[in-house]
A protein has these predicted regions:
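Cleavable N-terminal export/targeting peptides
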Residues: 1-35
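Short glycine/proline- and aromatic-enriched beta-strand/turn motifs that initiate or cap beta-hairpins
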Residues: 28-79
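Short loop/turn motifs that connect adjacent beta-strands in outer-membrane beta-barrel proteins
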Residues: 29-35, 97, 135-138, 170-179, ...
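Residues that define the transmembrane beta-barrel architecture of outer-membrane proteins
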Residues: 34-36, 55-59, 66, 83-87, ...
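Transmembrane beta-strand segments that form the barrel wall of outer-membrane beta-barrel proteins
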Residues: 40-46, 69-80, 100-113, 139-149, ...
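Detector for outer-membrane/organellar transmembrane beta-barrel domains
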Residues: 119-189
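Outer membrane beta-barrel transmembrane domains
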Residues: 177-213
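Outer-membrane beta-barrel "beta-signal"
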Residues: 205-207, 211, 231-243
């Protein structure tokens, strides 16, 4: 209980820091020290780490502000039939090839209060993520653990769901690339319904082609994902619009 109370204080502090940091980020942009960015993805199917979400094609916008090594951003997802909604806010800091990230996941249904932050009542999920990108080879490794919020096991205790993945990208040229990801979970977490200590949950292959339409670059990605734990697979297409 003492640990959970400390984590609760930590999360509330982080939330307040984010609110405090945002005006500074906006001021940095006005002074030329930051750069806004954004994109909108249209996907025929949304999958996250081998887990499907929604029942129809999905719109996924991103807006953010980059200030050197520091990033703050918002990411959202809504499907066309309104069976799935998600709004995330992230903070990240990059040092050379290592990126540390704190992500808050929230699913804004009408009954859920975005400001309900108590660990046993909130529908927020907070994850700490680390990603390392190798310098000489196009390989990355990522690890993430949920440290707070709506990630409870069958006993009602914090599960600390943990996921690792390794990925490889091969660029044929400036317009064509192929990537592959293998991901697995450790501990009895959300990826295996809080029942198994280990599970391979995400095997994904993607081919991306950069098209030019009216002098505008339009990346199109064809993906195939197989989740061995669920024994299910999906093929889907994503179009990306950046600004």
């Amino acid at each position: 209980m003492q640990i959970l109370r400390k984590v609760s204080v930590f999360w509330k502090s982080v939330f307040l820091l984010m609110m405090i940091a945002l005006p500074s980020a906006l001021a940095a942009q006005e002074s030329g020290k930051g750069e806004f960015y954004g994109s909108v993805d249209l996907s025929s199917k949304h999958l996250w780490r081998g887990i499907p979400a929604g029942e129809s094609p999905m719109v996924k916008p991103t807006v953010g502000l980059n200030m050197g090594n520091f990033d703050v951003y918002l990411w959202g997802a809504w499907d066309f039939e309104d069976t799935y909604r998600e709004v995330n806010i992230g903070l990240s800091y990059t040092v050379e090839n290592l990126t540390l990230e704190l992500m808050d996941y929230f699913y804004p249904w009408s009954k859920d209060d975005i400001f309900k932050l108590g660990n046993n009542a909130t529908t927020h999920q907070v994850e700490l993520i680390a990603t390392y990108e190798f310098e000489k080879i196009p390989v990355h490794i990522t690890g993430g653990t949920f440290i707070y919020g709506d990630d409870k096991n069958w006993k009602g205790k914090q599960a600390f769901s943990t996921y690792f993945e390794g990925g490889y990208t091969h660029e044929f040229d400036e317009r064509n690339s192929l990537s592959a990801v293998a991901g697995f979970s450790v501990g009895k977490g959300m990826y295996t319904d809080y029942t198994k200590n280990f599970g391979i949950v995400n095997l994904t292959a993607e081919y991306t082609r950069l098209f030019t339409v009216f002098n505008y670059d339009l990346p199109a990605t064809v993906s195939y994902t197989y989740n061995p734990y669920l024994e299910k697979s999906w093929a889907y297409v994503t179009l990306s619009f950046g600004f």
